[in-house]
């Protein structure tokens, strides 16, 4: 529909024509805010099409299940360009019986159909309220390159009258911060190995181990009870301080030696593999240890639309903890690993060896080894490197919809 001559008020009246029920609440996202949310949520859209949307006076929460685990994406009310809410919490299924979903508005596309504005209008009284989502975008017109035509699409859904949901609100006992490069190491580990995931923390180190013998380790500089972080001893590492500093992670909480084993590896693996960090974003691995019978590991991505996920775990027995810790520390301190030449020298040696074997001094391909760039001294993998983590595509699932109205 051509909306080139419409003002905002006229556009608003036309968009909601045909829905005569009085408006009880409204939420609006304009292009600037919506662009940041799309970049954060778009990699997870395939997993969120069948999610649940929860609106309240605090804002919007997108909730879905990832494998057997729970994932939450909160969008607070102050992030919306306009947010007016009255009444109790409202829960809506995002999926419809067709191909449309309320989450489609947060999908990034290469064509001009990426939305520039997003409206949510709420009508009715609980427990029979309705939500009208209006997505507005621009497409090229027929009168030249400067001609832009505004189009819109509407989806109408009714709220769920009966539901049960879990919203963890515990404060983590220990929180460890990973930068993008450190998070990439975790993604690589989980793509290479599988079946189980184990976290072990000591006073100075954190180990993440998977079945098959693969593990990564970080030196922990901890902020205890709000004080300044305890600096990691770098005296012995002055000759290679940059590499060591890249292996230091910062955290907060009351550090103690413990180990936890995730109950389901696939859910944690899927969550990590579906997340991509920019240079300005960080990942927090949170440990909830207050409940001794059911500890949890949390994953928190700090971004425009932060991502929270929680995974149940079990404590390792003192015997298993000691055995795993001893084996990893022994392997980390072996002279064979320490005596490995630096990365640049290793690559030069591989190149010369390849030239000697192939007789090709120009354009010789490096053999696939575990010591290629990105796999260093404190990252032990026994399989060839893999491609960077990507988004897993899953088939779409549909659910029954109350009403769907699409206008173009």
UniProtKB/Swiss-Prot annotation:
Q: Which Pfam families match?
A: Herpes_UL42
Q: Identify the GO cellular component terms for this protein.
A: host cell nucleus
Main localization of the protein described in the UniProt heading? host cell
Q: Which GO terms describe its biological process?
A: DNA replication
Q: Which InterPro entries match?
A: DNA_clamp_sf (IPR046938), Herpes_UL42 (IPR003202)
Keywords (A to Z) from UniProt = DNA replication, DNA-binding, Host nucleus
What GO annotations for molecular function exist for this entry? DNA binding
Please report, in chain numbering, the residue ranges of the motif Nuclear localization signal.
Answer: 344-353
User: Subcellular localization, per the record?
Assistant: Host nucleus
**How does this polypeptide assemble, per the annotation?**
Interacts with the DNA polymerase catalytic subunit. Interacts with the origin-binding protein.
Q: Which family does it belong to?
A: Belongs to the herpesviridae DNA polymerase processivity factor family.
What functional role does this protein have? Plays an essential role in viral DNA replication by acting as the polymerase accessory subunit. Associates with the viral polymerase to increase its processivity and forms high-affinity direct interactions with DNA. Facilitates the origin-binding protein loading onto DNA thus increasing its ability to assemble into a functional complex capable of unwinding duplex DNA.
Descriptive protein name? DNA polymerase processivity factor
- Record organism: Varicella-zoster virus (strain Oka vaccine)
